[in-house]
Amino acid sequence: MSDTSELQRFLPKDQELLSGILYRIGYWISHVDDTDEGDRSEQVEHQHLLGCLNKISKAPKAGALLNEMAEESCRQEQSWPRWETKNDSILDDVAAAVSLLKSQGTEDEEKSFAKASMMVGMTVARAFREEPEHAVEHEGYFSWLTEKANDMILAVTDKDAHKDLGVSPEEDNALNDLLAILKS
C-alpha cells in the first residue's frame, strides 16, 4: 500500500468491507453454480479472479481507491477464508459498499466500483469456459475493462446472453442480481 492510503479516509469497519468486496464478489460468482468439475474449475476461477484484481490494481483509469481496493483484496490472503464464509451476505455487503461510495466517495469512484465489480463477476463466470483474454496491462486496460463491463451490463439484460457469453444460467442470475444492486 502507498503512503497515502485512499482507504484511510473510511472507518476501519468500512475499510474491511471495501478491502474484501471485490474478492468476495468473485468468490461468490465462482460458487453460485456447482458445476461438479471438481477442484480444477475452482482453481481456474480463483486464478482468473486474482489476475483480474491484479489488473484492476494497476489500471490508472480505475482510480486510486479502486486500485487500492483490488490491491488489498490480493494482498490480504490471510483474510480470504474469513471473507469466503460471508457468501450469504454478499449482495447486502455490495449494497453497503455502493451506499458508502455514494456518501463518502466520488461519482467516478462509484462508477469505477460498479464496472470493476461486474468485470470481476464476468471474469470468474467465464473463467472455466474459455482461455483468458490477453489484455494489455497498461493504461488502456481499464478502457478495455470498462468496455467489457459495459458490454456485460447490456448483455445481462438479455436473458439469452449467458449462452453467448459462456455463462451458466445460475451465474447469469447472480450477475443480474449484482447489477441490480450496483444500479440502485
Describe each PLM feature range.
Residues 1-184:
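Acidic, metal/ion-handling microdomains and their immediate structural contexts
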